Amino acid sequence: MSRTLSHTTARLGLAAGLLLAAIGVRAATRVAAAPQAVTLDGILHADNDDTLAFTPDGDTVFFDRSEGKRKTIMVAQRRHGHWMPPQVAAFSGTWFDQDPLVAPDGSYLLFNSDRPVRPGGQPLVQDYFVGGRAPGSNIWRVNREGRGWGKPVWLGPVINNDVFVDFASVAADGTLYFIRFDAKARVMHTWRARYRDGAYLPPQRAGLGDPDVSTHDPAVAPDESFIVFDYGKVKGGLGRLCIAFREGAHWGWPIDLGDAVNRDLPWGAHLAPDGRSVYVTGNAGIGRLSLAPWLRPPAAAPAR
């Protein structure tokens, strides 16, 4: 999602309490530290960069950069332990592009764009929640080709069936999570589409929390054992970073990650390569949040 209007820290305590009561999340029962600031050797701009997405080896990062009314996806490489200055990604630079996401195996990348679906067409526009016309969004895919990346391909009408389909997250088996505005409920919902035989099945609502409450920016674990997302964000309002765990065929109730985590109004969660932390963007910039207080310790290797 794009950067939202800032809210003063002085209002956060009261507003957060009211929001928790209103949206019915489970209050935090474990203490989590605030996200740790991330600058990547100073190449990131705290005021206009967000949504870090790393390749599995951690040596390449994609993110989006805001410049006025434009958003562009940037890419940077780590060489000899140091991050090089970012460049505009080969598939970006013309349209309103944002929210890159690298698949768990690194074989492809997804991103959002308002670019025309067909050559020569008009860019997508929407008026759902900004009080007027704003860039629309569909999800596009770029495959890894050798040491580079291919051409963007529209993800198709099964997924992109609206002018605002946004913020993809992918499980290891290709199952896709994304957000789309529910015009009937007047809230943003997270949707889930399974991937079978090279195609997406029709998406269904993921079932995160109360259907009358907006969800944004999902970051799902490769095995779908947990999902981190923004819960309760409405027009002009606050959202809270939450986690939910898989319970059979359904998701458990959202668990609020606590005031220390939510003090900076984080959004845009992306799972880190370690699978046990997320990168988020807040009013102060980009941070890395350990999920260790919420996750079980990794299984020990069998004794030999």
PLM segments and residue spans:
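Bacterial N-terminal signal peptides that target proteins for export
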Residues: 2-14
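Bacterial N-terminal signal peptides
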Residues: 13-22
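Short, conserved micro-motifs composed of acidic
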Residues: 28-304
